[in-house]
């Protein structure tokens, strides 16, 4: 592997600009070689002056890079030493409190943890939190050690290449005189901190069991994503292949059934609505797998952003596997419905069995089938539903945003419950989902729960914004963002009034609803592009209409995403126009089935650029890991700390004007330190790669 590729694969993305600019040095050397005057047509003195002038410029650039690296390394080392001292103090306090509690326990009857006071519970909990805190700190030390090794190797490689191209030894001399005596290379305190951390965790937190301690401190491999196990790859191919084949079969079988029942007033929409939500979930999981793959390839650290455990999180292949497996079950269930007369399973039992399995798969308490990931999702869903009572983090409002694009899933779930409760004829031995057209209770707004369900995702985000305003006391962006979600309430209210009224007043509600939709679409579109994606930056330079720094390689991706977002944000105009002009429910039903998958696709595109913007904010603050204390802070201190961390320009523009755009909350009272590290943290031996080709 060439060192350029090796460096690109092993750097910490949030510190990218602080590494040696190896590729720029290579271009500088090759450009000088190509532009050098030929000794055959130019006198020797001119050639010597050319090379002398170039070398002066080259070594000046090397000095600037070396100064940058020394400064950054010194800052991070000082930060690591402060954190280590803080963790030592917190560990000592927790151990003292635990010993005091143990002595006091000897004077009274033994009590279970359920009978302990809140203060005593915190003491027991702090030991667990400290284990996670030291694991997080250890990962940050490994990051810094890799930074040290990669930069030294980069200088050695580029100076060696310099000497080879120009047939001199001045590069090696400069390395000995400057690089090998540079503080970032000669300072061995980082190695000492790593050793002391391992010893402290072994003796104080793991009872002297070094193997257990090192297992806790284990770091995932650095660099490109590791290949998935062979069996996982096999299952992905199997499930996805079977899913594609079964999907084609479902389409053909569905068309045949429609032809058979054509003209007999059979209503197939209950069946479509019941299975539509399941398809949207499968589509969402599959596209999320593509998101994950794209983030890894582009160096967007989604593991840090979502505060996942870098030692154990789902890769794109795992998401493809889950989506493919659930997709196969979805297709089998539909085929069982379509050919119910040939099976022993009543037709109405198939959807119940399918979604019952989906639900059991999610809440399965056994530690199998991605238990930790499922538990993380359930905990996140709970935090979304109870948003006003918790501090809101990125993962919380990201999931709530996904629910806004999956609102049809919630509405179809409500429809299914209503249909099975009020419309399905359970007295029929075979059940019935292909129903004759007639009065429908569940799909009309006369059943008022639908309007409430449609407002729920927007309500979750609305109260999250209010909670963030309460925590930060910043009207912008939180109250302005809450106003964006409040427009959804007006859209739903007037849509319900439009559908439940007749006569002239019906059109009054229609016009008000259209006005509300236009406001909502413009509001959300501008927020997507400017706030969530960070585009239309005045300092974009050559990245016209974008931002100063972009992660994805082609500008066309951004322009296509802007056009796509504009089109799909206003896609509601098509079904509304056709419904008003033709007043044909079948047209509304067809478009109501086509547009939700497109909205899921829009959210898939949105995810790429939303996390890119968050990643660049982390880069601006060189925030590769979170500096989180185990000791609880009061509300004022925590808010002040968040405001310091939330400065969008970060360390790059410390002396410039502060620009508060967005709040990124993090809980210091119950730290999840091991889940906040980078996926690319590891201690590696920098191999002697050769790219002299």
From Swiss-Prot:
Site entry: Important for inositol polyphosphate binding: 22, 26
Protein name: Xenotropic and polytropic retrovirus receptor 1 homolog
Location in or out of the cell: Cell membrane
Major localization class: membrane
Domain writeup: The SPX domain has high affinity for inositol polyphosphates, such as myo-inositol hexakisphosphate and 5-diphospho-myo-inositol pentakisphosphate (5-InsP7). Its affinity for inorganic phosphate is tow to three orders of magnitude lower.
Cytoplasmic topological domain: 1-235, 289-318, 364-405, 499-506, 582-693
Region Disordered: start-end pairs: 674-693
Gene Ontology CC annotations of this record: plasma membrane
Gene: xpr1
Biological classification of the source: Eukaryota, Metazoa, Chordata, Craniata, Vertebrata
Membrane topology type: Multi-pass membrane protein
Transmembrane domains' residue ranges: 236-256, 268-288, 319-339, 343-363, 406-426, 478-498, 507-527, 561-581
Keyword Cell membrane: yes
Key words, A-Z: Cell membrane, Membrane, Transmembrane, Transmembrane helix
Function per UniProt: Plays a role in phosphate homeostasis. Mediates phosphate export from the cell. Binds inositol hexakisphosphate (Ins6P) and similar inositol polyphosphates, such as 5-diphospho-inositol pentakisphosphate (5-InsP7); these are important intracellular signaling molecules.
């Amino acid at each position: 592997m060439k060192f350029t590729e090796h460096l690109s694969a092993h750097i910490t993305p949030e510190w990218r600009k602080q590494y040696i600019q190896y590729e720029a040095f290579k271009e500088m050397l090759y450009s000088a070689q190509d532009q050098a005057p030929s000794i055959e047509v130019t006198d020797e003195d001119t050639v010597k002056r050319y090379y002398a002038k170039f070398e002066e410029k080259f070594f000046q650039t090397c000095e600037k890079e070396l100064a940058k690296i020394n400064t950054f390394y010194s800052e991070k080392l000082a930060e690591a030493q402060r954190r280590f001292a803080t963790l030592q103090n917190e560990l000592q306090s927790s151990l003292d409190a635990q010993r005091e509690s143990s002595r006091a326990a000897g004077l009274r009857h033994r009590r279970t943890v359920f009978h302990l006071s809140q203060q005593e519970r915190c003491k027991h909990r702090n030991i667990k939190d400290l284990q996670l805190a030291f694991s997080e700190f250890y990962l940050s030390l490994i990051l810094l050690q890799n930074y040290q090794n990669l930069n030294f190797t980069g200088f050695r490689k580029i100076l060696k290449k310099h000497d080879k191209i120009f047939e001199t030894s001045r590069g090696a001399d400069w390395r000995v005189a400057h690089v090998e005596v540079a503080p970032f290379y000669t300072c061995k305190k980082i190695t000492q901190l790593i050793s002391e951390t391992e010893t402290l965790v072994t003796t104080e937190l793991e009872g002297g069991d070094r193997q257990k301690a090192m297992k806790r401190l284990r770091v995932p491999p650095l660099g490109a994503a590791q290949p998935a196990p062979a069996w996982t790859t096999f299952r992905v191919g199997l499930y996805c292949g079977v899913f594609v084949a079964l999907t084609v079969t479902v389409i053909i079988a569905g068309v045949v059934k429609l032809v058979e029942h054509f003209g007999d007033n059979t209503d197939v929409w209950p069946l479509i609505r019941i299975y539509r939500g399941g398809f949207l979930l499968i589509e969402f999981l599959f596209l999320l797998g593509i998101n994950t793959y794209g983030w890894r390839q582009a160096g967007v650290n989604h593991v840090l952003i979502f505060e996942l455990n870098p030692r154990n999180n789902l890769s794109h292949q795992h998401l493809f596997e889950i989506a493919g497996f659930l997709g196969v079950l979805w297709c089998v269930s539909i085929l069982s419905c379509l050919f119910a007369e040939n099976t022993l399973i009543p037709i109405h039992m198939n959807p119940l069995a399918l979604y019952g399995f989906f639900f059991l798969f999610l809440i399965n308490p056994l530690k199998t089938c991605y238990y930790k990931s499922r538990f993380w999702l359930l905990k996140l869903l709970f935090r979304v539903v109870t948003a006003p009572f918790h501090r809101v983090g990125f993962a919380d409002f990201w999931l709530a945003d996904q629910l806004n694009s999956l609102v049809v899933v919630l509405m179809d779930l409500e429809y299914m419950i209503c249909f099975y409760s009020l419309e399905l004829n359970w007295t029929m031995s075979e059940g019935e989902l292909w129903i004759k057209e007639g009065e429908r209770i569940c799909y009309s707004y006369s059943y008022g729960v639908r309007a409430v369900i449609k407002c729920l995702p927007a309500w979750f985000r609305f109260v999250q914004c209010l909670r963030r305003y309460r925590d930060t006391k910043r009207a912008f962006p939180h109250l302005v963002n809450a106003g964006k979600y409040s427009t959804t309430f007006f859209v739903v209210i007037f849509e319900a009034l439009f559908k439940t009224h007749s006569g002239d007043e019906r059109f009054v509600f229609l016009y008000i609803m259209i006005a509300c939709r236009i406001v909502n679409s413009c509001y959300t579109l501008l927020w997507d592009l400017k706030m969530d994606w960070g585009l239309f930056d005045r300092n974009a330079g050559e990245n016209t209409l974008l931002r100063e720094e972009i992660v994805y390689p082609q500008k066309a991706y951004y322009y296509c995403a802007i056009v796509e977002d504009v089109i799909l944000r206003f896609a509601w105009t098509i079904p509304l126009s056709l419904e008003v002009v033709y007043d044909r429910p079948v047209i509304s039903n067809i478009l109501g089935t086509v547009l939700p998958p497109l909205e899921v696709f829009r959210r898939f595109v949105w995810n790429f650029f939303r996390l890119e913007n968050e990643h660049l904010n982390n880069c601006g603050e060189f925030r590769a890991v979170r500096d989180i204390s185990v000791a609880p802070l009061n509300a004022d201190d925590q808010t002040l700390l968040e405001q310091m961390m939330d400065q969008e320009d970060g360390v790059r523009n410390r002396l410039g004007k502060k620009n508060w755009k967005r709040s990124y909350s993090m809980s210091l009272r119950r730290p999840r330190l091991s889940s906040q590290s980078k996926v690319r943290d590891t201690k590696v031996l920098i191999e002697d790669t050769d790219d002299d080709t």
